[in-house]
Amino acid sequence: MSAEQAVLGAALLDPEQLTHLEWLAADHFYRPVHQALFDALRKLRNDGHPALSADGPLPLSWVTDAVEEAGQHVRGLTAAYAHTLIQACPRTEHAPVYGRMVLEGAIHRTVAQHTIRLHQAARADAVQGEVEGALRTADVLTGVLTDLARRWGTDPRPVPPTAGPSAATDIPPPAQSGQVAEDERFLLAVLAEQPGAMDEVVAWLRPGDFADPTHGQLYRCLGALHHRGEPIDRITLLWEAQRRGLLANGTVSSEQLTAVCEGMVPGSADWFGQRVMRSSLTRTAAASARAIRALAQDEVLGPGRLINHALHELGPLDEVRARWATANSSPAPKATASTPSAGEPPPARVKAARARSTP
């Protein structure tokens, strides 16, 4: 607040300082009365106020006219407060530095405000089963960060925070709805029981997209079986989970895995996969918003670092968004006669199994 008072006091004392503050905007000030006064000073300067060409000491009309002009747009501004602003300025020639202090505070506030909007949009989309609001708000935030970087004079580029992990890691994620968990179980059942189902989602769905870490581990097992070209069913899934120690460490029990596989309902892997992906996208958007807001609330963090760290925190959302686009643009899998027969397994699977069994 003192920086806002100082820069306004400098402009009231020396209108020439406004020429060094072209990069500063009225909405960078926190208080509405300061915004109105800065706008008024700039308007009087642009209109060629007589005080600017007067010889000798600056006429008092420069101050009174600025107060009168600003008073048309905001209440509470008096000539007495204008003189308070003048007294708050130690040195008029330091106005550009005071202005950068004002801009620094504005950058922190602006980033925080837009992350709140992103978080709200992500939560609303999660309830409605949509993603468009979160994606649109994320685009706005990216544009704001780029514009703030230009105003601050820094190159906008993603830079990871140097002090420890992401700010979002200490914040627990919001509780997941029963529908999300149900979608994940249905998807796993389809993938385990429907031949060729993994081909529909393997290109764009990742274990981290599952809200339940156990479901993510089971999907990782299915992905490993698919990658090695081995048959996929509830028995091989249990086998892979056992090999990975998921049963030994209590991540999942054989009864839980059987229950998941027996919960298969009509539907395609692509359809359930996109529902899981949609939930992952809104969850990631909310996590990015929380992380960036924590950065914006750190007063020690300079604007350049804040902007670049914020761009870095948007990286996970960009990655999920790219896979979401792939999921929605990929052609539907063609129906093929690739269902395993009751006879000999395909040679590739035999070779993979033997190679895997060889010491």
Indicate where each model-derived feature is located:
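Generic structural concept
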Residues: H34, F38, A112-T115, Y219, ...
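Noncatalytic partner-interaction/assembly domains of nucleic-acid and motor enzyme complexes
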Residues: M1-A106, D147-S280, A335-P359
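N-terminal targeting/assembly segments of extracytoplasmic apparatus and virion spike/baseplate proteins
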Residues: R323-S329
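Long, amphipathic alpha-helical coiled-coil/dimerization segments that form elongated scaffolds
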Residues: P96-V97, I107-R123, L281-Q297
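Charged, low-complexity surface segments at secondary-structure and domain boundaries
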Residues: A122-D125, A168-P173, G223, A296-E299
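Non-catalytic interaction/clamp surfaces of large macromolecular machines
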Residues: Q113-V159, Q297-R321
